[in-house]
Amino acid sequence: MSYYVPADRAARMCKHFDDEFMAEIAREQIPERAKEQLEKLPVDLMRGVTRQMLGSRDYHIMGGFTDYLPEEKAMILMEEIADPADSLRISSFAQRKDRIARLTVKMDDGEIKRLIEAAFKSPDFIREVGLVTAEMGAKDQQRMARLSDEVDPAHRARSREMAKANGLEERLQAFYAA
């Protein structure tokens, strides 16, 4: 039904549904077909859905929606994610790493440091941070390098191995040159 109802009407209808039902609807939707609804839906209604999906560990669904969610809403919803590892899990399912990179550079230094700390607890997370950082400009890569060094200077050397193995070293030149 949600694809066949005008987006503004669907957003008004959603105000009458509870978070659990909204999360069930989200699980059945195709994110690219819900883009207009994501634009119209008030972010306050999305907060509860975000918490529901975090609770049920629906990272793959959240990552898919991140590709189409307006960035200003994504920044607000990121406040609902307390565990940096959950942010990395969601990011790993997002296809548009350029969007994740733009969201990441808007974070404060403390938030990014927590992501870096979480990333170095799992090889998959290190790769994810590398993929996102590779989408950043030189200035932001240098910021990531500085923050990485503040967390642990050995992290950059460890990440370089991942970058070589995944063909990212050239795209991360500014990160390693810093």
How would you label these PLM feature ranges?
Residues 1-178:
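Hydrophobic packing positions in regular secondary-structure scaffolds
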